[in-house]
Amino acid sequence: MSSKMIVLMSSDGQSFEVEEAVAIQSQTIAHMVEDDCVADGIPLANVESKILVKVIEYCKKHHVDEANPISEEDLNNWDEKFMDLEQSTIFELILAANYLNIKSLLDLTCQTVADMIKGKTPEEIRSTFNIENDFTPEEEEAVRKENQWAFE
């Protein structure tokens, strides 16, 4: 039995044929399918092809059914390897997951960033994310006092 296919079109003009059952992990796409708006393909104006490829890879792996069984542990291990990406790609995936409304991918990408921050000082976080400190020493001290609970 062949699956129904739909075409996703990236913002840079590339088309990807994907099983509908895989694509509807995106609530955005699921609503378009429900509204019967997929005949000519689905343009995804906010997602470039290099990111759409990663989103599709994620959705294919997370499309679990009788034909594609996978244990929770194997899926978690796969997710960990999947997120071994450059920072810029992780941030682009966050934007795509949010735009496409794929909660599990949004949770995974945001948790990855949270793990990059956890246990670090403000200086280490700035270094990790290449953020310039534009506070004066006085402003920084005021913020520390205001949020002292966070530094305990």
Curated annotation (Swiss-Prot):
Tissues expressing the protein: Expressed in young seedlings, cotyledons, roots, leaves, floral stems, inflorescences, pollen, and siliques, with a slightly higher level in inflorescence than in other tissues.
GO cellular component: nucleus; SCF ubiquitin ligase complex
InterPro entries, alphabetized: SKP1 (IPR016897), SKP1-like (IPR001232), SKP1-like_dim_sf (IPR036296), SKP1/BTB/POZ_sf (IPR011333), Skp1_comp_dimer (IPR016072), Skp1_comp_POZ (IPR016073)
Subcellular location: Nucleus
GO BP term (any one): response to auxin
One Pfam match: Skp1
Chain coiled-coil ranges: none
Region (Interaction with the F-box domain of F-box proteins): 94-152
Oligomeric and partner information: Part of a SCF (SKP1-cullin-F-box) protein ligase complex. Interacts with ADO3/FKF1, COI1/FBL2, EBF1/FBL6, PP2A13, PP2B10, UFO, SKIP2, SKIP15, SKIP16, SKIP32, CPR1/CPR30, At1g55000, At1g67340, At1g78100, At3g04660, At3g16740, At3g61590, At4g38940 and At5g49610.
Role this protein plays: Involved in ubiquitination and subsequent proteasomal degradation of target proteins. Together with CUL1, RBX1 and a F-box protein, it forms a SCF E3 ubiquitin ligase complex. The functional specificity of this complex depends on the type of F-box protein. In the SCF complex, it serves as an adapter that links the F-box protein to CUL1. Plays a role during early flowers reproductive development.
Name this polypeptide is given: SKP1-like protein 11
